[in-house]
Amino acid sequence: MIYFIFLQVVMVLVSVAFLTLLERKILGYIQLRKGPNKVGFLGILQPFSDGVKLFCKEVSLPLVSNFMPYLVAPVFSLFLSFFLWTLVPFISYGAKFNLSFLLVICAMSVSVYSIMVAGWSSNSKYSLLGSIRAGAQTISYEVSLIIIILSPLMLFKKLDLEGYLVKSSYVGWPLYLCLPLGLCWFTTILAETNRTPFDLAEGESELVSGFNTEYMGVGFALIMLSEYASILFMSLLFSVVFGSMSFLMFCLVVYSYLWSRGSYPRYRYDNLMHLCWKSLLPTSLMFLCFYWSLSQGG
C-alpha cells in the first residue's frame, strides 16, 4: 500500500509540473505570445528546469522570524494536499473510509492554518496582513462549499467518495441538471484555492505578494506545489460530484481555472465578501433545502 501511495504522490507531482507549463502556455496565447518554448522540445522540460532552480536556491531565514513554524508551514500545506489525494476513488489501494467526504471537508478546513502560520511566523506586517485576508476569505467560502457538497450527498445518502461515485453512475448525474449548483461550486473553489479573480491571498501583480512574501527557494516551491495539487484535486472532486468522474469534465474544470486567470481582473475585497454572504450562501442554502426535499420524497 505504501508503494502505491508513493507512486500516487509522484504522479501528482509530475501532473503539477505539467500543469504549470500548461498554465504558462495558455496565458501566453491569451496575451498573444508564445510562452516557454526554449527548454527541451516546445518547452516541455521547462517545469523541471524551474524546479531544479528553485530547489537549488539558498534558503535564508528572516532574522526576526519564528523559525520552526516558518519552516513547517509550507511542508504541512503540501502534506494536506497529498493527504487529500489518498482518498480518490480510482486508487483501489488508497485509504478506505466510510466518511471520506467528511474527511475531505476537515482537511480543507485545516489548510487555512498553514496560510495563517506562514504569514504570522514570517514576522512581516505585509505577510501578516496577507495571511489575515486569506484566512478570512477561505473561512467565509468554506461555509458555502460545505453546504454545496452536502446538497448532492443528501440526495444520494452517501458520505464516501467511492460509494457516491457508484451510486451516481447508476442514477446518472449530468451537470446540465444542476448547472446553478455547479457554477456556485466552481466560484467557491476558485476562492478556496486563492485563484484569479479571488487571489487576494497572494496578489501576485501587486508590489507585495502576500502571506508568502518572505518565502524563497524551497519554501516558495512547496507553497506553489500545494496550491496546484489542490487545484487538481478540486477539479477531480468537481468531476466526481457532478460528472460521475468524467475525465473530460476534469480537463474542462482545470482549463477553466487557467482561463479565468488570463481573463478576469481581481475582485475588490468587499465585493468578494458580498458575493459570498449575499449571493453564494443563500443560493447554496436554497439548493440544500431542495435536495433535502427530494431525498425525503424518494
UniProtKB/Swiss-Prot annotation:
The chain crosses the membrane at residues 2-22, 71-91, 99-119, 136-156, 171-191, 231-251, 272-292. It is a multi-pass membrane protein. Belongs to the complex I subunit 1 family. Core subunit of the mitochondrial membrane respiratory chain NADH dehydrogenase (Complex I) that is believed to belong to the minimal assembly required for catalysis. Complex I functions in the transfer of electrons from NADH to the respiratory chain. The immediate electron acceptor for the enzyme is believed to be ubiquinone. It catalyses: a ubiquinone + NADH + 5 H(+)(in) = a ubiquinol + NAD(+) + 4 H(+)(out). Its EC number is 7.1.1.2. Keywords: Electron transport, Membrane, Mitochondrion, Mitochondrion inner membrane, NAD, Respiratory chain, Translocase, Transmembrane, Transmembrane helix, Transport, Ubiquinone. It holds the Pfam family NADHdh. One of its GO terms (cellular component) is mitochondrial inner membrane. It comes from the Eukaryota. It is an enzyme of class 7 (translocase). It is found in: Mitochondrion inner membrane. This is NADH-ubiquinone oxidoreductase chain 1. Its main location: mitochondrion. The keyword Ribonucleoprotein does not apply.
